């Protein structure tokens, strides 16, 4: 049972998700408190491998009003993701050879109340693919509503 703290809905629209992974995330105490209060935004966030380590970039975690004025971390600071070395090497190989991208899908609390990040290997969609996906989604909605009317 996990509780989503933040979701990146735009990632499902902009990318074709190929494979998902779970990673730990290194946060400060005030950032965890802000996440629990729902003050996170993963829109336009992505994951990069820098010097053999995974970092979540461009994720916005705004601080709470109760945070000490002397300790206000940068809201868009890069945050280190924690994974096993073999997994990082596997991701690096796929990103460098296949031209894939790593995006953050969600931040959530696991069963032990530890913040985890759900990241994905994804391939960018072009405009035609996005339009096709929207048409298919609308067709599915219409089909469901038609079934509800007659059942």
From Swiss-Prot:
- Principal location: cytoplasm
Organism from which the protein derives: Campylobacter fetus subsp. fetus (strain 82-40)
Source organism phylogeny: Bacteria, Pseudomonadati, Campylobacterota, Epsilonproteobacteria, Campylobacterales
Q: What are its GO biological-process terms?
A: trans-translation
This protein is called SsrA-binding protein
For whether the record's keyword set contains Cytoplasm, the answer is: yes
UniProt keyword terms in alphabetical order: Cytoplasm, RNA-binding
On whether RNA-binding is a keyword of this UniProt record, the answer is yes
Give me the gene this protein comes from. Answer: smpB
Q: Which PROSITE patterns match?
A: SSRP
